[in-house]
Amino acid sequence: LLQALAIVRKRYPDVKLYVGRKDYGRIPPLARNAYERYIHRLLRESDLYDHVVFTGSLNAQQMKERYLKSQVFVLPSSIENSPNSLGEAMLLGVPCIASDVGGVRCLMTHGAEGLIYPADDPHLLAYDICEMFAHPEKAAQMARAGREHAGKTHDAQKNLEILHQIYTEIAR
């Protein structure tokens, strides 16, 4: 995502990425683990510190507010199964871009409810982000379709009934 952000910034110099995590730059260098050092180096080398906002831990209401203020939600995972964050963003009607991993295609149809890109392709991710920014009406259309789809796949009562049916069949 940071590699894609460096590309997006060339076209949208005011772009901001909000990350629900502690600020890597505020961690003393000797206290950083390998991943934190890697992220800090990427931020520094790409001159992205002014474009990334680390929100720290957020409660449910703060998360909802952050989602709703976002022009696009990006799930850049390299490993996922059924990502809750993608479902949350879709339920809130936020335009979504997700890496093509795990169960993402079960939650979202590429081009209809959001955009799906190869997890190892920051250039395509950057392109997709720029497309969402450049075509807000298309992004809003996908977000509406995503919200409708997520409303079906994340219906707690319906999912409980399906689970009950499965266990009833197993118990027979």
Regions found by a protein language model. Name each.
Residues P95-A98, M108:
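Short hydrophobic beta-strand element within catalytic cores of glycosyltransferases
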Residues S57, E65-S70:
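Short alpha-helical donor nucleotide-sugar binding micro-motif in glycosyltransferases
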Residues H110-G111, L115-P122, E131-P136:
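Conserved acidic donor-binding segment of nucleotide-sugar-dependent glycosyltransferases
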Residues F73-V74:
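A short hydrophobic beta-strand element within the catalytic core of glycosyltransferases
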Residues A31-L58:
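Nucleotide-activated donor-binding/catalytic signature segment of Leloir-type glycosyltransferases, i.e.
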Residues L124, E131, K138-T153, N159-Q165:
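A short, well-ordered alpha-helix in the C-terminal region of glycosyltransferases
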Residues K16-R37:
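Glycosyltransferase donor-sugar binding loop
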Residues S78:
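Aromatic "clamp/platform" in nucleotide-sugar-dependent glycosyltransferases that forms part
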